[in-house]
Amino acid sequence: MDVRDQKSVDAGIRRIVDRFGKIDIVVNNAGISGVTPVDAADTDAWLDIVQTNVVGTYYVTRAATPHLPNGGRVIMISSVLGKFGVPGYTAYCTAKTGLIGFTRSLALELAPRKITVNAICPGWTDTEMARDGMRDIAAAAGISVEQFKKEAMSRVPLGEMVDPSEVAALVAFLCAPTGDKITGQALSICAGSTQA
């Protein structure tokens, strides 16, 4: 499904419900990034990042929540860039900050149904999107990707990237019965790059 297209999302959610009868967990993980400095950003690229990351998440969540049972789970994959700014990434930071606000408000809306809503905020994570971002930043700085990665990791207290399996483990924890009292939170998994 194309999360930027409400009709596509609605049809996708209908297919899931037709096949499984309900939806227990929603993990909003669709997202894109890109360099978007305000003074040089392509407006279409800027809006595409916000449309995919925020509006797409809204479409999926809106279509899925009526099918969640009491005690269901909604998880947003945000970013530590939703907690602090980075030059050149205004659209991405804006979108990820928006997801944190959406999480907090939705947690209150769905609390009467005992549905928990949380955001996970990864730092540098060893994914294709992060590797592409490192490449773009390194190119803009006129340095090698290896040099940029070394410099970036020197600012991370634990000195390494997060593995996607570690993010998945946090999702699983929040979806387990042990996560039923955690809601409205923006949980960082970032090797210490932020303490917010």
For every predicted segment, state its role:
Residues 36-39, 84-90, 112-113, 159, ...:
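Active-site loop immediately N-terminal to the catalytic Tyr-X3-Lys motif
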Residues 37-38, 42-50, 152:
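Substrate-binding pocket helix/loop in short-chain dehydrogenase/reductase
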Residues 41, 85-93, 105, 133:
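Active-site loop-to-helix junction immediately N-terminal to the catalytic Tyr of the SDR YXXXK motif
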Residues 61, 95, 103:
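Active-site helix of classical SDR
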Residues 79:
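Residue(s) in the substrate-gating loop at a strand-loop-helix junction
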Residues 84, 160, 172, 183-196:
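Short C-terminal tail/terminal secondary-structure segment
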Residues 111, 116, 182-184:
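Short, small/polar-rich loop/turn modules that mediate ligand/substrate recognition or access, typified
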